[in-house]
Amino acid sequence: HNGHLSLVKKSISQNDLTVVSIFINPTQFNNVDDLKTYPSDIDKDLELLRLISDKIIVFNPEPDELYAGDIRLDKFNFNGLDRYMEGEFRGNHFVGVATVVSKLFSFIKADYAYFGEKDFQQVRIIENLIKEKKFKIKLIRCETIRSEDGLALSSRNNKLNFSSKKIATNLFKALNFAKEKIDVLGIDEIEQKISDNLANFKEIELEYFVIADEKNLKPIKHKQAEKCRAFIAACVSGVRLIDNVKLY
């Protein structure tokens, strides 16, 4: 989708050669049904990439190629970055992410790697991974791409019908509410108001809304001098979505 394509375009604008990896990684899914139903259309993906440039190298391995028939998770020290939010609710998700990204970085000796801030916790995990494993690569953070109504672009949006997509925009509205009120309301009050508001939508099942330190990702209960972000995860009509915004 256009979120992924924005990463590709940024890389092309800054580098001589761009490699795009397309791989649905089985080790980062904690739900078998989620893996089976995750949207995938390699022919459409390749066509979208051709419209940008015919000089893109596409790395689209099979699971056996990456894992050599032995899907085993590596061990990592995330320095607590995986304790909260996605790490709390999705089990070994980040171990799966770090395992496959380590393989990717080892296979493709790139100078830069482009990741979207929509998955901000993942960005921080990979920045930590690069430091821990001493990969000679720099992660470039890329801003979240949204539809006109504010919904963060995601492959999972394809599972939503028109009505559900409209309802899903309330996640971004909740994040914006936090951004508008962070200077005038306490964090507990912001979180409660957001929880109460989203409870009005029977299609939305809130998993978490957290305001956390941008660097160590620890949830905070009082405004601090350091940068922080608001993070949200919810199921909308049975489809799990995540989003975040920088507060200050």
What are these regions (language model features)?
Residues N2-E203, A212, N216, G238, ...:
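Nucleotidyltransferase catalytic core that binds NTPs
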Residues P219-I220, R229-Y248:
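Short, basic/aromatic-enriched C-terminal tail that caps enzymatic domains
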Residues E205-Q224, A230-F231:
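A conserved acidic, glycine/proline-rich C-terminal tail/linker
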